[in-house]
A protein has these predicted regions:
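C-terminal structural segment of proteins
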Residues: 1-183
């Protein structure tokens, strides 16, 4: 993912998943090793926090982001010949021991703003919600408060918003299923 990750390409498939899994980018340069949380790595469209003498030496996933966590990624592309995501969504979920409550939800997006991003308001609202279809639909609808997709020749803002809600719903449903929850 070097070219898409380091050019701050919002449509990069890996970028939304790295957001949802709280990745840390490890950079090594003349001054040693530096670790940057993925949420701070993307500065603006086309710009990331890497110094001219640095190279990426690792992408780290914190234990709390994978232990007892399950995730899924869906991408919507307009056609197979142009595999660039119109919108991409990745969800990482941790359920309670009885599988009836969402303890932690992380939602990452590509092409929902100028840089890959998290739906932090939706995530905060998801914590403690019951594992129900109504809760999934509520969380999915709430991502509209976090994202800011643009109009482009590939898709309108309205279409991207619609897709983001639907992809969140599908990713959350699949992640809950993978975690052992029943909707």
């Amino acid at each position: 993912p070097y070219t898409t990750l380091f050019r701050s390409v919002t449509s990069a498939d890996s970028a939304s998943t790295l957001q949802a899994w709280d990745a840390i980018v490890e950079l090594t340069g003349a001054n040693g090793v530096r670790r940057v949380p993925i949420q701070k790595f993307y500065i603006k469209a086309g710009q990331v926090d890497i110094k001219p003498d640095e190279i990426q030496t690792a992408i780290l996933i914190p234990k709390e982001s994978y232990e007892n966590c399950f995730g899924n990624y869906f991408k919507y592309a307009m056609r197979n010949a142009m595999d660039i995501a119109t919108t991409g969504c990745s969800v990482n979920v941790r359920l309670s021991a009885d599988k009836k409550t969402m303890e932690r939800v992380r939602i990452g997006f590509g092409v929902a703003g100028p840089v890959p991003m998290r739906a932090v308001k939706a995530e905060a609202g998801a914590a403690g919600k019951p594992v129900t279809m109504a809760a999934v639909e509520e969380i999915a609808a709430s991502v509209l408060e976090d994202i800011n997709p643009r109009d482009s020749w590939r898709a309108s803002k309205a279409l991207r918003q619609h897709i983001a809600v639907e992809l969140t719903k599908r990713c959350l449903m699949k992640s809950i299923e993978l975690a052992g929850g029943v909707l």
